[in-house]
């Protein structure tokens, strides 16, 4: 017998509040996966399971069309006290992206038999190296459309994301010295800063006429070096996060990085090694696909305003499926994208 559910606003908010109280940084999402599995069971989903990497997958409805509703369960590190203030709910992941994920859960639950099939997925590691979506894509899900849950606001549809290359750069110098006589040895941290600045200059040059949102950016995000406060460091590890706009390939960026590291290493006469931590190609969806048109009409019907198509400067799970499967895809969800990753994250 077909089941019908009415989800009240209070119940939806309480469900999100419970999800926010589960601390789920990347690759520590099991508690939320178990929570969602129970909710899916209560809401009449079938084939509820977690895959080999920890993604939660459940199915509702039947027949065609088949659509994937996919959000991520992980958040960036850092706890925020879950609390209500006026019309807002604060908490880590409220905007990015447990809010959109729970919205998708209830949207999928409304699917009725023989009107189409909805595959609901909560992925792991979106904020890390995209382990979840890469595994899901490798399994080639049987879907005709895909919507990814990320904060865009109700009147915006995300059609494009930058790509990403993250590199680890390791600098080794021959010797160390007492901090009171720094001229006796090269300083690995100082050398690392020279490498980072040179690589940044090489990658970011020639973009004077581009808008900021369309520029390639190279950002130093981590640096580790030194054994003692009074000894010059022999080793230094740093991480560079490089965001790549549509129209530039990861391969071309890697070639520039490789050449720059070799040239700087030779000039500075220090050992330098780099490795690729993560690589995701940029992606932009078709602006006039059936999915974009249908979502636009739905927003017009509810909000009485035509939504704006936007490109984001980050990188999302949409990149992976968009570049791998020939199906219409978009990203959409409640929340302010500028609140993501902040100490005042709210929805």
Q: Residue spans of the language-model regions?
A:
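N-terminal helical capping/dimerization or prosegment-like subdomains
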Residues: 1-68, 235-239, 253-256
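Metal-dependent amide/peptide-bond hydrolase catalytic core
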Residues: 7, 152, 159, 165-347
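Short glycine/serine- and small hydrophobic-enriched flexible loop segments
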Residues: 18, 106-113, 194-201
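Buried hydrophobic positions in well-ordered alpha/beta secondary-structure cores of metabolic enzymes
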Residues: 23, 40, 58, 69-72, ...
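Active-site nucleophile and cofactor-binding loops and adjacent substrate-binding regions
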Residues: 48-49, 89-97, 308-313
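Active-site metal-coordination/substrate-binding segment of hydrolases
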Residues: 64-122, 343
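Short glycine-aspartate micro-motif
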Residues: 66-68, 89, 144-148, 166-168, ...
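Acidic/histidine-rich catalytic neighborhood of metal-dependent amide-processing enzymes
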Residues: 98, 102-166
């Amino acid at each position: 017998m077909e089941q019908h559910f009415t989800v009240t606003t209070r119940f939806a908010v309480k469900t999100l509040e419970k999800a926010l109280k589960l601390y789920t940084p990347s690759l520590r999402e099991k508690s939320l996966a178990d929570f969602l599995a129970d909710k899916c069971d209560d809401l009449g989903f079938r084939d509820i399971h977690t895959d080999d990497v920890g993604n939660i997958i459940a199915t509702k409805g039947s027949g065609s069309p088949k659509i994937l509703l996919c959000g991520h369960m992980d958040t960036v590190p850092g706890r925020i006290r879950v609390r209500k203030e006026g019309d807002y709910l604060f908490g880590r992941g409220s905007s990015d992206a447990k809010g959109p994920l729970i919205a998708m859960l209830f949207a999928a639950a409304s699917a009725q038999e023989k009107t189409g099939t909805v595959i609901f997925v909560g992925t792991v590691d979106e904020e890390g190296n995209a382990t979840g979506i890469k595994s899901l894509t490798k399994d080639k899900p049987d879907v005709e459309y895909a919507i990814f849950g990320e904060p865009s606001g109700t009147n915006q549809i995300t059609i494009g994301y930058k790509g990403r290359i993250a590199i680890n750069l390791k600098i080794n110098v021959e010797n160390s010295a007492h901090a009171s006589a720094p001229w006796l040895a090269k300083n690995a941290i100082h050398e690392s800063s020279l490498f980072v600045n040179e690589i940044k200059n090489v990658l970011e040059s020639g973009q004077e006429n581009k808008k900021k949102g369309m520029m390639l950016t190279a950002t130093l995000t981590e640096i580790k070096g030194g054994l003692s406060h009074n000894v010059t460091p022999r080793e230094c590890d740093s991480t560079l996060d490089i965001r790549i706009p549509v129209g530039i390939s990861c391969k071309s960026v890697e070639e520039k990085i490789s050449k720059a590291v070799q040239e700087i290493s030779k000039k500075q006469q220090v050992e330098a090694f780099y490795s690729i931590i993560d690589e995701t190609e940029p992606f932009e969806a078709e602006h006039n696909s059936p999915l974009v048109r249908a979502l636009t009409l739905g927003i017009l019907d509810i909000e009485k305003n035509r939504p704006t198509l936007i490109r984001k400067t980050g990188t999302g799970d949409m990149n992976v499926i968009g570049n791998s499967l020939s199906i219409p895809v978009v990203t959409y969800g409640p929340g302010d994208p500028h609140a993501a990753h902040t100490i005042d994250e709210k929805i």
